[in-house]
Amino acid sequence: ISECLVGSEMCIRDRWLTGVDVLITGDRITGLVPTGSVKAREIVDLTGKTILPAFIDSHVHIESSMLTPAHFSDLVVPEGTGTVVADPHEIANVLGTEGIRFMIENAEGCPLDIRFMLPSCVPATPFEHAGAVLEADDLAPFFNDPAVLGLAEVMNVPGVLAGDEKLLKKIALARSLGRPVDGHAPGIKGINLQRFAAAGITSDHECSTPEEVRARIACGMAVNLREGSSARTLRTLLKAVTPENAASCLFCNDDAHACDVKARGNMQKHLRIAVEEGLPAMEAVRMATINAARHYGLKEVGAVAPGWRADLAVVDNLTDFNVTDVFLKGRLAAQEGQIIWKAPVKTIPDTVLSRVNTGPLSEKTFALPLTGRQARVIRLVPNDLLTEEDIRPVVTSDGLFDAARNPGLVKLAVIERHHATGNRGLAILSGYIREDARMDGAVAVTVAHDSHNLIIAGGSDADMLTAAEALRCTGGGMVLVKKGHVEALLALPVAGLMTTETAEVFIEKQAAFYAKLRSLFDFAEGIDPVMTMAFTALPVIPAVRLTDMGLFDVTRFAFTTVEV
């Protein structure tokens, strides 16, 4: 026996144990024995603490942290996370199979066990232009990689219901191999939900209400209960959890900024919220560990038991789940919030760098003609990814929408950035700034789910152009412009989505960017100025979105007009 963890309480799936030591040899748990009954080369005293299985994030887009997989590992391991089920569809929408390959290779050798679901919808719909198109034949070779678990979130629900041949071929491929197929079905209910599940979809992470959680479980699906940087709905969704259905519930982040992970924790925030909402700690732990392991076929992790991999998170209490020690593959990986076992340094290939190709831009690119006095507006919903359609009175100047004359409204632009097509969509956004505020500047980012075109919110065409040109010259990232001057810029050179810097360095820069952003503009409550804006381009979440092809009505699955 090489290692013995002593003096602690522990969770073993269905009950708490005390007076038991955990024996570890190599990367395996070799026994649970009475305290002091076995000698080991190394004794780790965990008196007063509780040993839990290392946490599992059941659905996450690593790219949303804006870190590469290796640096993401260094961020979340000290938070007690041992395994993540990642969907690399962000970078796949920019770089196709090359992006998937980069993520898998960059994750190799990390202490964090990074498993992948293959992107099912690149692009998410035919109503936008991404950097690549992936079909079943493109995905098939990746299923031979042991890091790949299944097929990632199927977002094109209308395509499934209509029997889209290419989409169903991807689902059939995964099912033929016995792999799970994740879903993405916001607002879908009744017979359409049953048809979606019957197509082979095994989970959904897009629930917004307890009723939606219950409906999916009734259809035999697992539900990934989400608490991310923009979508913060876990407290609401937990109202659906009962002792009878808890085994079908998993925790996930989906999309979370690095600075948010550092501030609120990774999976600990889910555990903390669950206990605050009255869920027994044991049940919460299962939802953060074994439930996800069982659903995704991870047979070595999720429990503290003989023969299982020694992936353990040690906490000092079961209220806020403060993580003090993390053991992965039997090694001490982190302690007191500091990474000890760092991921190997990886060289970033030139082929994934500097991907902003918009073609020429001018102020006219951002001109939004309106002939009437009313407009169809995208209204943001605080702390959610859903949007609503709103008809608002607007003021124009020379026949063009003038954000400077419309308090509470900003102009939104999505510009195709992959193939210099010249495509651009324009819309009006409410709920981004306070109702009585004006935005005398612009915010732009090359993160715009899921096709990741260039997205810009602003109060003047000149500032929006300045922001766009800044990112075109930089090769991707986030930029803040006020009255013609670039006030802050954060480069994201990897596909325009991720930094090459460490988590520690990037979080400091990201925090400074956000501080500057919030000091210059009056954003509405419950809005992440970057992440919330980035999701306004995703045409698979109701109700109204903007792509590089125009304003899109998700409910009708058809384009609409700003003009009323």
What feature does the model see in each segment?
Residues 240-321, 327, 446-457, 468-472, ...:
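His/Asp/Glu-enriched, well-ordered alpha-helical/loop segment
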Residues 35-38, 43-109, 462:
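Metal-associated gating/positioning segment near the N- to mid-region
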Residues 133-153, 159-225, 231-251, 262-283, ...:
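Histidine/acidic residue-rich metal-binding segments in metalloenzymes
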Residues 293-410, 419, 539-544:
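Hard-cation-handling environments
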Residues 73-180, 244, 487-490:
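Divalent-metal coordination cores built from histidine and acidic residues
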Residues 1-12:
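Short, small-residue-biased leader/transition segments that mark boundaries at the very start
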Residues 365-459, 463-466, 472:
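Non-catalytic interaction/regulatory modules that flank or connect domains
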Residues 410, 427-451, 457, 461-564:
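Catalytic centers of hydrolytic enzymes
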